Curated annotation (Swiss-Prot):
The species this protein was found in: Mus musculus (Mouse)
Motif interval(s): DXD motif 1: 47-49
Protein name: Dolichyl-diphosphooligosaccharide--protein glycosyltransferase subunit STT3A
UniProt subunit comment: Component of the oligosaccharyltransferase (OST) complex. There are 2 OST complexes, OST-A and OST-B, which contain STT3A or STT3B as catalytic subunit, respectively. OST-A and OST-B contain common core subunits RPN1, RPN2, OST48, OST4, DAD1 and TMEM258, and OST-A contains DC2/OSTC and KRTCAP2/KCP2 specific accessory subunits. OST-A complex assembly occurs through the formation of 3 subcomplexes. Subcomplex 1 contains RPN1 and TMEM258, subcomplex 2 contains the OST-A-specific subunits STT3A, DC2/OSTC, and KCP2 as well as the core subunit OST4, and subcomplex 3 contains RPN2, DAD1, and OST48.
A molecular function GO annotation: metal ion binding
Placement of sequence motif DK motif: 592-599
Length: 705
């Protein structure tokens, strides 16, 4: 038999090949597990914000960067409009357009929509690779491979990176971990080269997502802790000063960011730590030149003077408005009740709600239990890099509890620390395995004081293997059932187990596009603005950007008012059509009736809506009901009438009266009414979307037609 010598590799080469194979499999798994939605439905954009991102990306790919940067969108926020180039983070769009043009350069003809659909899964594969390298810097390659495999399927990250989820977070998590990796390399080496690469990665992060504020506060916090623990060195000084100076200059090139890095409160911590670095370096220089007594006197004097000057200058700048205060979302992170009490538009967003305990297990499963193990290992073997990952883990744990959206920021560090924890447990017990045959064991070995060492080690390894397998099954199930359903196309199981598709949203937008005038203005709640603009190509009053609370409040006032009062508002805003989402027939719970109280709160939050009181829409016992016991104010408002018009004659379930709402589980209280100021224009197949046309003004005393 011929010996195949070329297959005989050295141990080092086998090790490298195995690592490459495992990492490649993790990257492929990361991409493929996010394709459930495409396989089950089709290549379609999900949710709401991604439709705006897709629309702007398409404009960039077709018109070029110059027109994109100077684009004024007259289809949004009528009659105000919106400047697109200066009000978005363009990293996502530029990345997609660049990939699109590169593929076309090589004559790979792919539609820009498909580039957008598959971008997040592609970057999740890149995230897997970066996670491996980052974890390797913290422990070793084994921990890195485990962390990479974990982040490939962790539901907390998949929720924002499935195929079709074309949002900023799809590439931002990759940018964030890349910045962290470069930062740790810069801290370890003290090299300007790595620090400059960290600044470039940070620039990419700034261009992609507003969450960059977390980075520019976490890195300075890391430096501050290193100072307080006596670990500050020349390496840290070079790394941070380079990252801060270069990163700040680069970040200011993003139009939406502008001068915020030197003017806003969110960035002042980074600037303050930069100043502390200079003071620390100067103090070290003086210490080397003066005797201890002279240094002590000078040090106290300088610190007192500098501290007083900084506090005075900072207070003056904030009082005069030179340094802008924290934004509402930032206040909400520090005080979870702030948005609920002061800014209802922020509190109304579901992803801004506090996280429930069950969400942690649902999105992280095994990682919840292995995270403390990895944290313990890092505390037991402290280094500059491990202090950073500890701080990342602790801070992201807090922020994820305040806002469910930030589970996305927590998921990567959970994978990293869990990978370290699992790796440490397996390494510890692997050493206790005895793979020699029992009959060849020496008597000395058999009489050991730890006779069942091998059995305990085998048991622990099997337990860890079982938990890792259940984690994989759980993650795959959550991905398939919870995070792979595009909100634009809904599905349900029929009585015979078959899948029923509800395509009402696209049906309604298609009708709007082809059956309404080009200059028609559509009023809907802000959730659906991006979809209407992108798919129906019609002008809308408010959308998901939510930059003008007064304008949104005006729409809320119209929805919460009687027909007569609402008609005045609609004529004032030049509304042609009104669109509402209604789930009473199909059982769709995310409809406008369930969102209605937020319309009331936001509508009543401005001066023009002071007459709208939330308590008026409750029963005397404090209940929100749509049946006969419901508040008369609710039963006669515009939103109620648009949703339930003609619904009183519809049978929704067997043995139930007509007009039975399957979401609220109640027979509606106001059935027999007609619309005075609106006329029904279109209702989709399953009544999910209802469109009404606003009647013209009275003509010399005649009724509206």
């Amino acid at each position: 038999m011929t010996k195949l010598g070329f297959l005989r590799l050295s141990y080092e080469k086998q090790d490298t090949l195995l690592k490459l194979l495992i990492l490649s499999m993790a990257a492929v798994l990361s991409f493929s597990t996010r394709l459930f939605a495409v396989l089950r439905f089709e290549s379609v954009i999900h949710e709401f914000d991604p439709y705006f991102n897709y629309r702007t990306t398409r404009f960039l790919a077709e018109e070029g960067f110059y027109k994109f940067h100077n684009w004024f969108d007259d289809r949004a926020w009528y009659p105000l409009g919106r400047i697109i180039g200066g009000t978005i983070y363009p990293g996502l769009m530029i990345t997609s357009a660049a990939i699109y043009h590169v593929l076309h350069f090589f004559h790979i003809t792919i539609d820009i929509r498909n580039v957008c659909v598959f971008l997040a899964p592609l970057f999740s594969s890149f995230t897997t690779i970066v996670t491996y390298h980052l974890t390797k810097e913290l422990k070793d390659a084994g921990a890195g491979l485990l962390a990479a495999a974990m982040i490939a399927v962790v539901p907390g990250y998949i929720s924002r990176s499935v195929a079709g989820s074309y949002d900023n977070e799809g590439i931002a998590i990759f940018c964030m971990l890349l910045t962290y990796y470069m930062w740790i390399k810069a801290v370890k080496t003290g090299s300007i080269y790595w620090a400059a690469k960290c600044a470039l990665a940070y620039f990419y992060m700034v261009s992609s997502w507003g969450g960059y504020v977390f980075l520019i506060n976490l890195i300075p916090l890391h430096v501050l802790v290193l100072m307080l623990t006596g670990r500050f060195s020349h390496r840290i000084y070079v790394a941070y000063c380079t990252v801060y100076c270069l990163g700040t200059i680069l970040s200011m090139q993003i139009s939406f960011v502008g001068f915020q890095p030197v003017l806003s409160s969110e960035h002042m911590a980074a600037f303050g730590v930069f100043g502390l670095c200079q003071i620390h370096a100067f103090v070290d220089y003086l210490r080397s030149k003066l005797n201890p007594q002279q240094f002590e006197v000078l040090f106290r004097s300088v610190i007192s003077l500098v501290g007083f000057v900084l506090l005075t200058v900072g207070a003056l700048l904030m009082l005069t408005g030179k340094i802008s205060p924290w934004t509402g979302r930032f206040y909400s992170l520090l005080d979870p009740s702030y948005a609920k009490n002061n800014i209802p538009i922020i509190a109304s967003v579901s992803e801004h709600q506090p996280t429930t305990w069950s969400s942690y297990y649902f999105d992280l499963q095994l990682l919840v239990f292995m995270f403390p193990v990895g944290l313990y290992y890092c505390f037991s073997n402290l280094s500059d890099a491990r202090i950073f990952i500890i701080m990342y883990g602790v801070t992201s744990m807090y922020f994820s509890a305040v806002m469910v959206r930030l589970m996305l920021v927590l998921a990567p560090v959970m994978c990293i620390l869990s990978g370290i924890g699992v790796s440490q447990v397996l390494s510890t017990y692997m050493k206790n395995l005895d793979i020699s045959r029992p009959d060849k064991k020496s008597k000395k070995q058999q009489d050991s004081t730890y006779p069942i060492k091998n059995e305990v080690a085998s048991g622990m390894i099997l337990v860890m293997a079982f938990f890792l397998i259940t984690y994989t099954f759980h993650s795959t199930w959550v991905t398939s059932e919870a995070y792979s359903s595009p909100s634009i196309v809904l599905s349900a199981r029929g009585g015979d187990g078959s899948r029923i598709i509800f395509d009402d949203f696209r049906e309604a937008y298609y009708w709007l596009r082809h059956n309404t005038p080009e200059d028609a203005k559509v009023m809907s709640w802000w959730d659906y603005g991006y979809q209407i603009t992108a798919m129906a190509n019609r002008t809308i009053l408010v959308d998901n950007n939510t930059w003008n609370n007064t304008h949104i409040s005006r729409v809320g006032q119209a929805m919460a008012s009687t027909e007569e009062k609402a008609y005045e508002i609609m004529r004032e805003l030049d509304v042609s059509y009104v669109l509402v989402i209604f789930g009473g027939l199909t059982g769709y719970s995310s409809d406008d009736i369930n969102k209605f109280l937020w319309m009331v709160r936001i509508g009543g939050s401005t001066e023009t809506g002071r007459h709208i009181k939330e308590n008026d829409y409750y029963t005397p016992t404090g209940e929100f009901r749509v049946d006969r016991e419901g508040s008369p104010v609710l039963l006669n408002c515009l939103m109620y009438k648009m949703c339930y018009y003609r619904f009183g004659q519809v049978y929704t379930e067997a043995k139930r009266p007509p007009g039975f709402d399957r979401v609220r589980n109640a027979e509606i209280g106001n059935k027999d009414f007609e619309l005075d100021v609106l006329e029904e224009a279109y209702t989709t197949e399953h009544w999910l979307v209802r469109i009404y046309k606003v009647k013209d003004l009275d003509n010399r005393g005649l009724s509206r037609t």
